[in-house]
C-alpha cells in the first residue's frame, strides 16, 4: 500500500469539505438536530406523561402528516435535481417554457409522487397499529393542503439556492426539512420549547397545523383559527418563495450558473 496515494485522496476530500460551507454544515447538522429534536420529545414526555390518552395514534398520525411535508418538498427538489444530474438543466430553460409553467408542472408532479409514497404507508398503519389518519375527518384535507403548500414553498427555496449556488447546495435539499422538525412542534406543544425558540416557531405554519391535529384527536374539536393562521403564513412564504425563485433564475442566467450546472 502506498501511503502517499492514500494521503493524496484524503486531502482531495478534505479540501472539498473545507472549501464548501454547505458540506461543513451538513456534517454538524445531523447530530445536532437529532439531539435537539429527541431532547424536546423526551422533555415533553417527562413533564406531561399523561398528556395523551392515545399516544401511539397521535404520534403516528403526526408522523404521517409530517411525511406529507417531507415528501412534497423532497419530490419538488428531486425533480429539479434530476434535471441537473441528467445534464438536462440547460435544455430545460432553452425549451419554449415559461418559468411559471415549469413551476406549475413541478408542483403537480410532486403531488403525484407524494401520494404514491404516502398511500401505502397510510393503508399499512391501520392493520399493523390500529391507527387511521382518516379519524381526523374532513379537516384532514385542509391540513394536507396546508402541509403540501408549505412543502412546495420549501422546495422553491431550495431550488432557488441550487440555481444561485450550484450543486454544492444539494445537501441543503436533504437537510432543510429536518432543521424545521424541532421548531415545528410535530410531536409536542409549543410550550416545550424555550421562550426564544417559541418566538421563532410561531412564525412557522407547522406549529399551527400540528397543534390543530392534536386538538382534533384529543378533544374532537376543530379550531379554525389555527388553520387560518397556518394558511396566512403559507401564503406569505409561498409568495416570497416564488419571488426568490424568479430572482435566483435571473441572477443565474446573468452569471452563467445555469449553463455550468447543465454541463
Q: Where would I find each of the regions flagged by the language model?
A:
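Hydrophobic transmembrane alpha-helices and immediately adjacent juxtamembrane helices
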Residues: 1-263
